[in-house]
Structures are given as structure tokens and as C-alpha cells.
Amino acid sequence: MQPDFKKIHSFENNLINKRSLKDLMYQAFLNYGIVKSSIIADRVKNLTFHFATQSGVSLSVEDLRVPAKKRELIGLTRNEVETTQKRYEIGSITSVEKFQKTIDIWNNANNFLKDDVLTYFRESDPLNPLYIMAFSGARGNISQVRQLVGMRGLMSNPQGQIIDLPIKSNFREGLTVTEYIISSYGARKGLVDTALRTADSGYLTRRLVDVAQDIIVRESDCGTTEGLWATELASNNFLNLRGRLLAEPIFTQEGNLFAPANTEITETFLQTLKTLKDHSPIKVRSSLTCTSTRSVCQNCYGWHLSHSKLVDLGEAVGIVAAQSIGEPGTQLTMRTFHTGGVFSGDLTRQVRSPMEGKIEYWEGHKASLFRTMHGKMGFRLKEEVNLIIKNSFGTTISFEIPAESLLLVNTDQYVYENEIIAEIQKDTNLILEEEQKEIYSETSGEVFFNALDVKVQADKQGNTYKTNNKAGLIWILQGSFYELPAFSETLLKPGLNLSKNTLLSRTPLYNKYPGWVQIDKSDNGTGICVQNFSVTLTNAFINEKVENSSRLQIKTDNQDFQFQLTTEPNSVLKQGDTIAVLDDNTYRTTTGGIVTYSLENPQASKKRKSVKNLFKGYFYWIPEETFKFSTLDEVRLSFSKNESIVGVGEEIMPNTFSKVGGFFQIKEAEQEVTIKPGELFELTSAESQIFDKSDRFVKPGNFIVPGKIITQQLVYLEFFELNEKQYILARPVQVFEVPKEEDLSLSQSFFPYNSHEHIKLKVIKRVFYKNWEKIISNNGINLLQTFIVFDFKQEQQGLEPRLEFTPSKVPGKSFLKIALYEVIKTFENNRKSSHSSLPTTTRNFVSNKQYVASNTLIGQIETTAGLVNKLAAINPHLNSGNMKEVLILNPSDLKKVFCPNVELLKKVSVGDLVRIGTLLNDNVKSPYSGQILEIFEDHILIRLSQPYLISAGTILHATSNNLVKAGDILATLVYETIKTTDIVQGLPKVEELLEARKVLHNALLAPCPGYAYVRFNKHGESTVQLIGLDNEVQTLALKPGIKTKFNSGDFVEVSSALTDGLISPHTKLETLFSYFKNRYTSFEACKLSFKLLQLFLIGEIQRTYRSQGVDIADKHVELIVKQMTSKVCIEDSGTTTFLPGEVLNFQKMADIALVAENKGEIPPSYVPLLLGITKASLNSDSFISAASFQETTRVLTEAAIEGRKDWLTGLKENVIIGRLIPAGTGFNYLENQERLAREKGEIDATFHREAKPLSENILDLRLVKKE
């Protein structure tokens, strides 16, 4: 197309940025072709590089100029945030609305600052290198510039939720520690995403290429008259029609032909079309409706977008489509990294009043009352509204507010310039999710519900919970929260004034067991014990503090025993505790060694000897010295003595001497030196032949060496080789005897005398070493020790055993006594509450050493007020066994508000709840939120209170009139929030759609078009009633807690979502087919179902990409979706030879069914099938292509069993076997035409081969083959 030179200006003096350069090259390319455009591009490149080099643009810290207005803007924003906080404190907005408003305030401030940065650079420093780089499009973008010199703004945490603390600093000023930590979330997220998602994106591209590689433009026109209406296209944008061909002619309003069918839609064509007042609907050709077999025709595909001309024959458009969809995935992966996880929440577009004036609009428009995310009331418009603003000078401005927008003003309302009057929802991929947020009480106090509609509900497990069905306030009437002792008796009623010593409650103290009273004076007289039982050793005295420890001397008939006490007096004892250890060196060794309890072979059992068997018998000790060393240098002097005999007192290591002498060995592996006392005997070769070489004991009088050496004592023989000679080491053995009879008895006196079997002191002997255990010690050990232990056979609840010293008549000596005490716990000892406690005292009704029977009242705990104040409330819902809760009003909880004319007080009365700003009379506003307690002549007394606004649907945890502490949960707000959409959601979403994955939490779909109503049955269960166009009524069950997406009486289309949730494409296809099959033939029903599903999938994929700012031409997505929706599954074979469950191409199945009908036979029945790209690749007509993708063994085995043929139509199969690919220069048009004709002609033969009725005999089949 030649350019119109009259319209082209000869010279333009404008600043050219990246976008202008792109437009310039596009126009050159469109008008002058590829050769001239490349020359222009080359010259532009040389020109720009020349001047860029000359200018030497570089970035320095000085170029990063922070706008002067930033400080002022941050200050104003903080004031606005504080105002929002005050609104929350008076209960005008909920905590969620406060959070959302705070986020929007900071987001708006960030955007204002961004605009200010632009204005500052443009007006003050247009040659700033940062400005030149970012806004020419050379390097960086506005988001990065904003973070450098504006503010970083709001960040989202790893869960995708926005943190309401913005980063107010920029990189030029530097971040604070807190800001840096918040900032690190996004940095880490970016790095992880880049690493993980690149692989996902690459794999997605591979699957897409595999599914679409055989789509090649094989013919110029398939001859179809079908297509898509312009309104059905996913982009739904007039300009996106460019590059397509008309499927039907366009007529003007007068009926004249404007453009015939198959006309290419160019920009000029669209501009001319816009000038027409009215014309017939536009229907365009599409790959979805192309009837070419295993390909797409030129006319249905349209332009090749790289050179804006009709696509060439032999073009591999499938691979182009796959790469066009897969490549942005890699780009998108990096997107998070570039912005560093910064949140930009432009979810709505605010409409501000262009001038001051009065609002007018027609009040008859359909709308519903709605509360915005910021807590403002407005109207949700159901239809477009024409808004008019008139000012006092008669100027009128009118503009349209579209449907689904929020209108925030009433008619006849006066508005100021720049006031927000409406919010328009942007068309972004908003992911709404239900969230919960707990409301915690900031102060302690009494709960009061104001205007709440409380309903008790039960969950699936039968647990009940309370919900609120109407917006209202939870008030916390302030006061100090206290817990009174358990089982206490409250003596006062709410509302009484309290003095300092007013008694609030008393708790009686009873004992469970009889005994003697002991009052512990050390615990301020509050500790009371009752001694129930005691046992005293009568044949033992304690010598206190002899050699820094107490000694216990026990006398028996034969001798005195000295024990060392191991337990301090007044200690609490447990079963088996050791009280004293006998001072006895009978069983003490001088060195380490090996202990054994029998003269059996050392390989016998090495279990620990039981205690009861140690009161009699013997054990045997084989002494041995062992010294550890850390380096060989320590034993270097002793190397010459290794494996020889050393004497007593000989130096082994520096400053280390042998105590016993003996056979010396250095063991380098264990880093130790051993000295084994004993005699060394050398064996002759003859003796070694007959000698028993096992280690063993030899008793006195027996031979060590047969017929040669007799031992005079018990020895232990060890056999070893040394310098190729054989030796025996006879080691001496010490024998320790444990007496058979008990030689120590304890005389014990019990009180009372009938209880002696429950508690006693026992003497036991213990060993601590296993049989044949080697003990390393240089100072010796006690092999057996005698202990006095505490034996408490029957523990009684509430009794505490204690060890005591009882004075005797002998000065400096005491008796050992163990007593059982019942400790009467007072409130101070028992309480584990973190709340500040009230003053408590214990009054005793008994004296020290008084005997009391069981269940005697021995005292009471008294709780007093402590300060002059007022008792506000007692929790009425607690039983007597729990801690009792009281609320006391302190002077700080009450505030005076002076009102000069109390008689004019008509607005409020005693008991009313008022918020900050409420009018008390005509002149005075309340400075506090609270309850009016009393009204005096000149002032009002207000009890401070905190209101919390809660919305409908909130789960309540507190109960009205109950008491709560600061930090207690009052309620859980249930609300919908918008999750920040990121490629972490975006790429898996695309993959989910392309793989046609099953969806969890499906939305309920309308089974037919009609009018939908929500109905409730007598059990309170909700259902959806759908009245179809033929007046057929269908009832659908609704799950509890599921929200509907329509208003009762709305018209809904077939397969549209009735409830919240994701739409499963499989469910949608089933719904569509089950509706259409009752109204059309199987072929038509299948075709219609596929078409609607294809449009849905294309729309969803495109929406996901566009939400990330990526634009892909619809024709690419159409090709992939066509491959996913090209198969059907046979349900019933009819009279053909197909089997139920077989998967066939839809077009092939339709042809076979047509032939069957023409022959007067029953065609097979089938249902449409949606396959994900992986399954579609595996179900490809080419088994070579499928086998090279996945599951090679299975695909090849099935193909071999079925005897399949591969017609080599795609690129992949040709590459694998080494043929020229049938695309580009390898594409033969005439050959393809012949092949297409042959394929169409073979349909009838295919039917006879594959679908002949089984009833006919083999002869018929042979006749057919001959024909």
C-alpha cells in the first residue's frame, strides 16, 4: 500500500521517546516495507549512538533529587492516618476498614509523590540523567525512579498480604532498620521466583510447542461461512479486529454493501467503519471455526503479525502461537524482581468532582446500598447513571458513571472541587478471598452489645458459635479487672462505693487430715500446716555442722556407725530419696580396675547385679591404673618402657607416677596408658602348645603353668604375644565380702502408732557398676555404699513429707524426724494470675501446736478493696468453683464534663452511651466515649468506654454483660479481601487453564438460562430455584456458608456461575452439553458446547496475562485452545465397531456419523472431551510425536499393538526420522492439495474399514475391500 504523501508532514520538532520511536518504525515498516525500514532503523541507531556517546550521560548520587514537597506530603498523610485512627476509636469504622483506608491513604500519597517527581524533573531539571534514561525508555521505569527519589511505598508480606506500615524513605535517603527488614520480603521473593518460575515457564513453552507443532497453513481457504462475532472476542476491543478477515459482508444502515466477505480488516478500514452511524454486526474468520483438516487456512488465520500481511502457505503458525504464549511467562517471572515486591493497589479509579456545585441525577436508577472498603456508604449501580454538576454561575458539567461502579453522593448534595464522588472498578484480575480478623479488647471492662442481632449457629461437628447478623457496636465499659480466690464468697453487690478496707470476699480454709497446727512465722503468718504423722530415729543422734556437714551417728548393740547427711533440714522428700551415706572405706580401692561378681568366664552375662543379692556373697576386683594423654609428646619419655614391667613410684608421664607398678602398655588408638599389676611368665613353645590361652581366674593352690608354677592367691590370667614370644600375666585379685546378716538396724518410733506401715527409713546397700565393667580412676572408688533412704509406700493426696531435726536433751545433738504435713495454701501462694491483685490477708482461727480434727475451719482469706473506688460488676456467668471476676471503677476510669446549663440537657440521660463528638446539649460536645453515670448541677460524670464497630456476619466470642481483660478476643470479623495478584499466582493460573486441571471448591453453574431466586426451606437451608425460559423449574442445593453471585430475580445464562468459587472448565463443558443435547443434534450440541468453552478459556487465559500487563494476540491462544477441544469420547458405539471410551477427533467422528446415517445405520453417540495440553500431545494422531514427548514405552507399545500408521504431517515426526519438514521451503502446495483431496475422499473408505456393522459377515467385508 503506497503512503498518502499529503498526510505526511515533512518535518516535526518533537521529543522522541521509546513509544514514539516504536510508532515511527511501525509506520515505516507498514508503508515502505522491510528493506527501507531496516535502513531507517540503522540510521536512527547510528544517530542516537553518536549523540549518546557525545553527551556522556552518566548517573551520580547528585542526580537523585528528592522533591521538596515530600516532607509536607508525608506530614499531611500522617494527619489523615491519625483521623482514620480516631474514626476507628469512636466506632465509626471497623478495624478492617481502618486497615484498608490506611493502605489507600499511603498508596494515594505515593502516587501524588510520583506525579510530583515527574513535574519536578520536567520543570526544574529536564536534562537530569535519571530523567533522560527513565523517560526515554532507555533504562529503568517510573516505578524504579519513584523508589529512588520518592518513597518505596507499601510492601506485601510472603503470604501476599499488604503490610500497613509503608516504607516512607527512598534509596537516596536510605532505609531505617525496620524498613530494611520489611523491604527484604520482596527482595527474597524476587530471587526465589526468578529461580523457580523460569523452569516452569520453559516447561510450559515445551508442552505448548508439542501440542501445536503440527498446525501448518496448508490451504488458502477452507470455505467455511462460520466465524466469531466481534463482541465474542476475548479482547472485545475494536482495534484487535485488525489483521482478521470478514466472515460475512458488512452492510450500511441503508442496506448498501460496505465490505464483502473475506475483506482484510486494516487500520484504514476500521477508521472508515467508525465514521458509519450504523452498520450490520461484524463477523470475522477465526482459527476456532476453521474446517481445515489438521491445519488452519490462510483466510481463517488472517495476517501474520510480524509483517501485517496475509500469512504465507507453509507457515508453522502452531509453533509461533506456542512461543508467543510461553515466552511472556519467562518475562513475567522477572517482574516481581524488578519492582521488589512493591504493592501498587490501583484497584478502583476514583472519580473526583471537576468543580464545586450541586449533584443531580435521576433517582429511578437500579442500585443497591453498599458500604465501601473504607467504611463509607454508597450505591452499587446496576445500570449506567448520567451525573450532572451545576454551580452557582450556571455552569453545567455532565458525565456517565458506568454500571457496577460505586456512587458516593446523593442527588441535590453539594460537593467541593476534587471531592471523590464515585469509584469505578478497574477490569483487573482481582482474586477475592474470605479472611478473618480478630478484634481484641484494648482495655479491661464490662461487655455491652449495642444494636446487635445475635444468632446461635452450629458447624458440621455440632459445635455452636454465635454470629451477628446486623452491623452494630460492642462497647467495653472500662474498669480494673480482678480475680477473687476460688470458692470465695462475695459479700457485696455491684454499684456500691468502696472504702480502703471494705471487705470484698472471704474464702474459708479447712483441713482434710487431723493433726497438730504449725503456723509458719517466716511467711508473714500466712503459711498454715497441720502435722498429721511423724517417724523418729531413736538409736541415732545428729551432730550438727561437723566439718561443714551434719553427721548422723547410729548406735547398735555391736558398734557405732557414722553417716554423712545428704539432705538439708526442712527439705520436702520424695519416694526413694537418699537421706544419708555411711562413712565406710571397707569397699574402697586405691586405683581403677575391673569389677566382677562371679569367677565365671568374662564372656558371661555382664548385667548389673540386683540390690537384693548384694546383701550376701563376694565380688572381685582386678586393679589397673589408666592414664589418658592428649598428645604422644606426653608419653615420649616412656616409649622405652612400653610392654615392660615398671616399679611403684616410677614416673609414667610428666608429674604422673605409678601407685602399684606392673606391666606397662601404651595404647595409641585409645590415647591411654595402662599399668596392670602382676607377674609376667614366659611360655616355652612346648608349654604354649598345651596351654589354655583363654583369660580366666585361677584359685589358690592351682597351677598357673601346668606342672611348673602354683599360685598362693586368687589371680586372673591374661595371655598375650610380645616380640614373637608368648607370655602369661598373672594379675592379683582383691576379694570383697558382703556379710550375709544385717549388721545395721534402725530403731524407729511412729506417731500415731497405728500408721507405721505407710512410711519408714530403710538401710540399703548399692553398687553402681556392671559386671566386668572397666572403671578408670586414679584416686580409687567405693565399690559398695550403704545408704539410708526414705520409703513412702502409700502416698496420700495433699500430704507433704519433710525432713526435720528434733532437739534432744544432749546439747548440740538432735534426733532425725520425718513428718507428714498438710499445707493449707493461702490465696497468695495459690494464685498464678498476671493481673494486679487486690490486697489479701489471712485470718487464723487456731493457735500454734493446737490439735485439730479433720474438716476444721482453721482460718479464712479476706480480700479488701485497697483504694477508694466503686464496685462496677461481678461476672454472673461463673460457678462457685472458678476464680470469681470483679470489675472495680477507679477514679481514672471516670471523667467530668462541665455543662453550664444542665437543665437544657435534652439529648442524653443517665445510662446512655455516647461517643466523642456527641452533642450533650446545644453547645457542649462530649470529649470522651463512654456511659453517662451521673448528672449533676454543673457537670456530667462519664465512665470511659471503648466502642468497636462490627459488621454483619461477624463471629462473636464475648457475651453481653460479661467481664473481659485487656487482650481478650471479643469477635472475629469475616470479610472479603483482594489478594495482590503476582506472577506467582499468574503463571500457575495459566498452567492450570492450559492443563484443564480439576478445580477445588467449584462454583455452582446454572444448568439452563433463566431467572434465579434464593429460597429457604423450613429447616433454614437455602436453595437456588431456577425458572427456565420454557418455565421448567430446577432446584439446586446450596452448601452452608456459600455466597451467591446474583440477586433474586436476576436473569442468568447457561453455565454461568451462581455462587462464589472457581469455574471448572470440565464442569462447564458437561453443563453446556447436557443443556444443548436436548435441543440439538449431537453434532450441533458438541459444536456449540465447544465454542462457548473455547471463548471462556481464551477469555480466562487472556485476563490472566493482561492482569500482568502482557498483551498476546487472540489468534495465538485460539490455536492452542482449538487443539485442547478437538476430541470426543464415544459413549455408545451404535452399530459400528468402535468401543465405548475410545477417543477420536471431533471432525472425523462427525464425518463417520454422517456416513452411518446415510447408510441407514445407528451412528455412535459421543460426548465432547476437554484435554489439557499434555494429554492432547499424548493423544496426537502421530505416535512418533507423542512418544518423543512423554511415556515413550506406553505410546510405542500401544501403537505397535494397534498397528498404527504415522502420516508424518507435523514438524516433529519429520525431524525425528530425518525428513525435510513440511513447512517453509519444505512445503509443497500441489502435493498438499492432492493429499487433502485424498484424505477427504478416503472418509467413506475409512468408515467401511472401521465402522462396518458387526452383524455383516466376512464375505461382505471382502466385497467392500474389492470395491
From Swiss-Prot:
It comes from the Eukaryota. It is an enzyme of class 2 (transferase). The keyword Transmembrane helix does not apply. It is found in: Plastid, Chloroplast. The keyword ATP-binding does not apply. Pfam families: RNA_pol_Rpb1_4, RNA_pol_Rpb1_5. GO terms for biological process: DNA-templated transcription. One of its GO terms (cellular component) is chloroplast. One of its GO terms (molecular function) is DNA-directed RNA polymerase activity. Its EC number is 2.7.7.6. Its main location: plastid. It catalyses: RNA(n) + a ribonucleoside 5'-triphosphate = RNA(n+1) + diphosphate. Keywords: Chloroplast, DNA-directed RNA polymerase, Metal-binding, Nucleotidyltransferase, Plastid, Transcription, Transferase, Zinc. Binds 1 Zn(2+) ion per subunit. Its cofactor is Zn(2+). SUPFAM superfamilies: beta and beta-prime subunits of DNA dependent RNA-polymerase. Zn(2+) binds at C222, C290, C297, C300. InterPro entries: DNA-dir_RpoC2_beta_pp, DNA-dir_RpoC_beta_prime, RNA_pol_Rpb1_3_sf, RNA_pol_Rpb1_4, RNA_pol_Rpb1_5, Rpb1_funnel_sf. In plastids the minimal PEP RNA polymerase catalytic core is composed of four subunits: alpha, beta, beta', and beta''. When a (nuclear-encoded) sigma factor is associated with the core the holoenzyme is formed, which can initiate transcription. Belongs to the RNA polymerase beta' chain family. RpoC2 subfamily. DNA-dependent RNA polymerase catalyzes the transcription of DNA into RNA using the four ribonucleoside triphosphates as substrates. PANTHER family: DNA-DIRECTED RNA POLYMERASE, DNA-DIRECTED RNA POLYMERASE SUBUNIT BETA. This is DNA-directed RNA polymerase subunit beta''. It comes from Emiliania huxleyi (Coccolithophore).
